[in-house]
């Protein structure tokens, strides 16, 4: 059985026991999280939401809070001695899926 959930403005296909990286959640390591926006449940009994499946949820455990690799942006204007260098590290949350309630 698998499900498609929406969190952080993105859609993720999840299965029980799988680990996913999502946009940062306000939870500590070891906390339980519940995703209520389930738009599809697949398996023996397929359910499609309009826009979400009624009564469906996905439960998981927060494994890690972290930051991705640095992305560097560099802008310059030729012949003007002007340049700008900026870095950004996007925060993420690693979640292990425990149960899919359909």
UniProtKB/Swiss-Prot annotation:
GO terms for biological process: translation. GO terms for cellular component: cytoplasm; ribonucleoprotein complex; ribosome. Residues 93-102 have a biased composition (Polar residues). Residues 77-102 are annotated as: Disordered. Keywords: Ribonucleoprotein, Ribosomal protein, RNA-binding, rRNA-binding. The keyword Ribonucleoprotein applies. Residues 77-88 have a biased composition (Basic residues). The keyword NADP does not apply. Pfam families: Ribosomal_L21p. One of its GO terms (molecular function) is rRNA binding. It comes from the Bacteria. Part of the 50S ribosomal subunit. Contacts protein L20. Belongs to the bacterial ribosomal protein bL21 family. This protein binds to 23S rRNA in the presence of protein L20. This is Large ribosomal subunit protein bL21. It comes from Limosilactobacillus reuteri (strain DSM 20016). The lineage of its organism: Bacteria, Bacillati, Bacillota, Bacilli, Lactobacillales. The gene is rplU.
């Amino acid at each position: 059985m698998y499900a498609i959930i929406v969190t952080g403005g993105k859609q993720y296909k999840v299965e029980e026991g799988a680990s996913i990286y999502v946009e940062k959640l306000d939870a500590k390591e070891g906390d339980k999280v519940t995703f209520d926006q389930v738009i599809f449940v697949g398996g023996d009994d397929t359910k499609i939401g309009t826009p979400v499946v009624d009564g469906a949820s996905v439960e998981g455990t927060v494994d890690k809070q972290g930051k991705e690799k640095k992305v560097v942006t560099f802008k310059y204007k030729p012949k003007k001695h002007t340049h700008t260098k900026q870095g950004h590290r996007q925060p993420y949350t690693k979640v292990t899926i425990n149960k899919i309630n359909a």
